From Swiss-Prot:
This is Laccase-2. It is an enzyme of class 1 (oxidoreductase). Its main location: secreted. The gene is LCC2. GO terms for biological process: lignin catabolic process. Cu cation 1 binds at H84, H418. Cu cation 3 binds at H131, H420, H472. It comes from Trametes villosa. Residues 22-147, 159-301, 368-490 form the Plastocyanin-like domain.
Length: 519
């Protein structure tokens, strides 16, 4: 690679967030390139030349046609790929859901695949990422916003655009498949694609610009592979108005603990003295704190000098507590208001053997035939569906309750669990022993808490979306170690509900023909 092209890619990676958003119709060219978002140069995976991947936007009701073009060449980060559009229900388009070996075979290098899906009734803050092994940790991850022209919160803010999306990224100097199976911490935290590591104390930091007197809707997106972050902005309170694509009753906080894959919209009133203020995202482990500007970005008021802040952090007195979150509009909780008061209740027992995680004594090993293809080919029962012990058929039009008790047998807690194809009611949250069947928040990623707190997080949802849907820990290193199951929802109706395009059917024969070095 010539020096000119090399510099071009590095420069691109540093200005990722200055590029225009794409969508709802777009091509995403997935490639390998050297990048240095924290001042340390490494090969990574870029989309349309940038890390993090570009912001995708659209409006409620849009049809998204996202053509993924795989030009990957570096086998250490895998040459194939598969992209999940996180938080979208994909009703009728389970084939476009993205998880490799659950909903599709990966896209081979040198090939492309069109993800074509509607978003009829969702709006809010989402994201997208590779769903093949630990590939998203190497760069294939970015924000996705669906705007609501009739947003019920519109009167609460003045500005909501590309400049008010905030991404939090754990960044590693070693490719995920070449590093430890379970890393002991990231090398840097990137906020909007920029950050510092211990070895790069002069790297550029992201600047978030505001104008005094205006109210901003910031969309905070954790595109983390592992740590959760405690997010705050010196001198400012934050009013949370959206949780994982669900409008919520306004809640005033001064810090937000955000777990991998979660999203929050908050309104910030730029009513403080014109100046520079530290934006902080402290990981729960690894290189913590803010010495030398690590884990930080800058909130800069118009008219403030171009300088690093001198503000200090004050102790959080009104942190975000999940049980204080409630939907803006009433969302009835499925089932009756007693523990187990549903059509089907499942308890998930976690375990770990030093190498792999287990749920109810099974570790998830990706099958050679995607679960969706198994169902379309006639497999119907848990006995028929692979991987054995990891696929749970769920009846149609039923209420489901899942309990996820925290246990010392599954280290690395708190584990954030994500259910595909649904938002669920969090009827018991981490840190709480009470059950709320009246007005709990609905979301798609929930912290399962810690064994020390005796947590027994409980969620509920309705089976109204035929297809195989992943439920997994969103710490990507844990998912890769088998911390997942699949719900095969309403198996009998999957085929009729999800007609698949020929291009989807072609993915497996192409992928299966690859040598291991080309996968």
């Amino acid at each position: 690679m010539g020096l000119q092209r090399f510099s071009f890619f590095v420069t691109l990676a540093l200005v990722a967030r200055s590029l225009a958003a794409i969508g709802p119709v777009a091509s995403l060219v997935v490639a390998n390139a050297p990048v240095s978002p924290d001042g340390f140069l490494r090969d990574a995976i870029v989309v349309n030349g940038v890390v993090p991947s570009p912001l995708i936007t659209g409006k409620k009701g849009d049809r998204f046609q996202l053509n993924v073009v795989d030009t990957l060449t570096n086998h250490s980060m895998l040459k194939s790929t598969s992209i999940h559009w996180h938080g979208f229900f994909q009703a009728g388009t389970n084939w476009a859901e993205g998880p490799a070996f659950v909903n599709q075979c990966p896209i081979a290098s040198g090939h492309s695949f069109l993800y074509d899906f509607h978003v009829p009734d969702q709006a809010g803050t989402f994201w997208y990422h590779s769903h093949l092994s630990t590939q998203y940790c190497d760069g294939l991850r970015g924000p996705f916003v669906v705007y609501d022209p009739k947003d019920p919160h519109a009167s609460r803010y003045d500005v909501d655009n590309e400049s008010t999306v905030i991404t939090l990224t754990d960044w590693y100097h070693t490719a995920a498949r070449l590093g430890p199976k379970f890393p002991l911490g990231a090398d840097a935290t990137l906020i909007n694609g920029l950050g510092r590591s211990a070895s790069t104390p002069t790297a550029a930091l992201a600047v978030i610009n505001v104008q005094h007197g205006k109210r901003y809707r910031f969309r905070l997106v954790s595109i983390s592979c592992d740590p959760n972050y405690t997010f705050s902005i010196d001198g400012h309170n934050l009013t949370v108005i959206e949780v994982d694509g669900i409008n919520s009753q306004p809640l005033l906080v001064d810090s937000i603990q955000i777990f991998a894959a979660q999203r929050y919209s908050f309104v910030l009133n730029a009513n403080q003295t014109v100046g520079n203020y530290w934006v902080r995202a402290n990981p729960n482990f690894g290189t913590v704190g803010f010495a030398g500007g690590i884990n930080s970005a800058i909130l800069r008021y118009q008219g403030a000098p171009v300088a690093e802040p001198t503000t200090t952090q004050t102790p959080s007195v009104i942190p975000l507590i999940e049980t204080n979150l409630h939907p803006l509009a009433r969302m009835p909780v499925p089932g009756s208001p007693t523990p187990g008061g549903v059509d089907k209740a499942l308890n998930l027992a976690f375990n770990f053997n030093g190498t792999n995680f287990f749920i109810n004594n099974a570790t998830f090993t990706p099958p050679t035939v995607p679960v969706l293809l198994q169902i379309l080919s006639g497999a119907q029962t848990a006995q028929d569906l692979l991987p054995a012990g990891s696929v749970y058929p769920l009846p149609a039009h039923s209420t489901i309750e899942i309990t996820l008790p925290a246990t010392a047998l599954a280290p690395g807690a708190p584990h954030p669990f994500h259910l595909h194809g649904h938002a669920f009611a969090v009827v018991r949250s981490a840190g709480s022993t009470t059950y709320n069947y009246n007005d709990p928040i609905f979301r798609d990623v929930v912290s399962t808490g810690t064994p020390a707190a005796g947590d027994n997080v409980t969620i509920r949802f309705q089976t109204d979306n035929p297809g195989p849907w992943f439920l997994h820990c969103h710490i990507d290193f844990h998912l890769d170690a088998g911390f997942a199951i699949v719900f095969a929802e309403d198996v009998a109706d999957v085929k009729a509900a999800n007609p698949v395009p020929k291009a989807w059917s072609d993915l497996c024969p192409i992928y299966d023909g690859l040598s291991e070095a080309n996968q």
